Amino acid sequence: MGRAEMVVGPSAAAAAYHLKNEAISWWEEVNRSRAWQDRLFHVLAILYGIVSAVALVQLIRIQMRVPEYGWTTQKVFHFLNFLVNGVRSLVFAFRRDVQKLHPEIVQHILLDMPSLAFFTTYALLVLFWAEIYYQARAVSTDGLRPSFFTINGVVYVIQIILWLIIWWKPVRVLVILSKMFFAGVSLFAALGFLLYGGRLFLMLQRFPVESKGRRKKLQEVGYVTTICFSCFLIRCVMMCFNAFNKAADLDVLDHPILNLIYYLLVEILPSSLVLFILRKLPPKRGITQYHPIR
């Protein structure tokens, strides 16, 4: 038995080594292939287009259901999803043309601005949950919306300043700083979901078992918290690699597989799942937690 294992062992190791080399070779071949680059970027464009269309359809359904209400949190959330995914779809549909734009800062803006808008879109969910949580505990929510706008304003201002500095002096250190800043923003968003999603989940658990909709709302909050926390945490880690490792650079044409995996994990799948989970339309009458944005 021992001798047989000694014979099989090296053979299995050699086969694994061969498979590894083949996988690396295939990865490099796809990355170098102009045709494969275009195919994978167009796949991303189509997927983003589908998510954008779904968000728009849901926005129209909500408007038809409650036309008497203005821009509610739910409507703004779906509109921003439509906008972010629609812009991403156009960017990837014309990805090769985007790479030719000059000055180079225009490329950074087109590739990074949707990420900032994605942060704002899902920060809106954190705001909504924070309002529900504090209202349920009879705590004033007057400072939440100003805080939301202030945080987003600071994030956008800092990013715009970084873009202007990069435009003025395009050095590698500033690009790294910009990517690390966004990694920090992503970590902040992940912690926001963990804090308020977790608080709301624990609060719902304390409701009486017979409470109407308790089980469904628990699942909704639990799933969305897990999905959004994971996607922003993955984005944070990936942006750190992206900043310091050229092999993980997402802003180039010759990393199409990495782009496909990254954007699937941090934007397309999370957006699709969250839109599916939050697909329920608001009630027509007797609305208690459906507030217009003021």
Swiss-Prot record:
Top-level taxon of origin: Eukaryota
Topology class, membrane: Multi-pass membrane protein
Protein's cellular compartments: Vacuole membrane
Inactivation phenotype: Reduced efficiency of intracellular multiplication of tobamoviruses (e.g. TMV-L, ToMV, PMMoV, and TMGMV), characterized by a reduced accumulation of viral coat protein (CP) and reduced amplification of TMV-related RNAs.
Usage in biotechnology: TOM3 inhibition via RNA interference constitutes a useful method for generating tobamovirus-resistant plants.
Keywords from the named record: Glycoprotein, Membrane, Transmembrane, Transmembrane helix, Vacuole
Membrane topology, Cytoplasmic segments: 61-75, 130-147, 194-220, 278-294
GO CC terms in record: plant-type vacuole membrane
Residues carrying covalently attached carbohydrate according to the record: 31
Membrane-crossing segments per the record: 40-60, 76-94, 109-129, 148-168, 173-193, 221-241, 257-277
Pfam families: THH1_TOM1-3_dom
Extracellular topological intervals: 1-39, 95-108, 169-172, 242-256
GO biological process terms held by the UniProt record: viral replication complex formation and maintenance
Family label: Belongs to the plant tobamovirus multiplication TOM1 protein family.
PANTHER family: THH1_TOM1_TOM3 DOMAIN-CONTAINING PROTEIN, TOBAMOVIRUS MULTIPLICATION PROTEIN 1-LIKE ISOFORM X1
Summary of the function given for this chain in its UniProt record: Necessary for the efficient intracellular multiplication of tobamoviruses, probably being a membrane anchor promoting the formation of the replication complex.
Protein name: Tobamovirus multiplication protein 3
Phylogenetic lineage: Eukaryota, Viridiplantae, Streptophyta, Embryophyta, Tracheophyta
Gene name of the encoded protein: TOM3
